[in-house]
A protein has these predicted regions:
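Glycine-rich nucleotide/cofactor/substrate-binding loop typically near the N-terminus or early
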Residues: 168
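P-loop NTPase switch module centered on the Walker A-proximal segment
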Residues: 1-109, 115, 149, 158, ...
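Conserved C-terminal guanine-recognition region of P-loop GTPase G domains, centered on the G4
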Residues: 99, 104-165
Length: 168
């Protein structure tokens, strides 16, 4: 890994309800950026971020994990410290600690489940820390999932500042 100055480092936190797909998104980003050559699976117990024995047994994140990603931006290389946080609020202390150092947030939303409590809490935390954020929608391939309905619900709940910039 290269050496980066502070102006080239970004801390990005993954937030959302438990089971929304934060760790899967982290795995995909790690693979796309070349951190790993394969995507781990939670059910197989071989993800980069959920490596603790208890996390593997329970099949969900208990602690925040840092995944260093390197990205070639328009102004040169940058390092993104991706913070994969627990979604279950028994572990909210982990989320509070991680969000306090974040520069931006990705709120992961399960399209079928819609706006769950974890999504609302994630938004509230981003408001509290004045963090720029975006929604990343997962599970759109389910027959009972509607991307358009979810976008309307997000606009209704969080205001007109919600705007899709990538359509499925």
């Amino acid at each position: 890994m290269n050496v980066y100055g502070t102006s080239q480092i970004r801390n990005v936190i993954l937030l959302g309800h438990g089971g929304a797909g934060k760790t899967t998104v982290a795995e995909a980003l790690a693979m796309i950026t070349g951190v790993t050559k394969r995507m781990g699976k939670i059910t197989d117990g071989n993800t980069i971020s959920d490596y603790d024995k208890e996390e593997i047994k329970r099949q969900f994140s208990i602690s925040t994990s840092l995944i260093p990603l390197e990205y070639e931006g328009e102004n040169g290389p940058i390092k993104i410290n991706l913070l994969d946080t627990p979604g279950y609020f028994d572990f909210v202390g982990e989320v509070e600690e991680a969000i306090s150092v974040a520069d931006a947030a990705i709120i992961v939303v399960n399209c079928k489940a819609g706006i769950e409590v974890g999504v609302e809490k994630a938004w509230e935390m981003c408001e509290k820390y004045n963090l720029p954020r975006l929604f990343f929608v997962t599970n759109m391939d389910d027959d009972h999932a509607s991307y358009r309905e979810l976008v309307l619900k997000l606009e209704t709940r969080f205001g007109r500042k919600i705007a899709p910039f990538q359509l499925p």
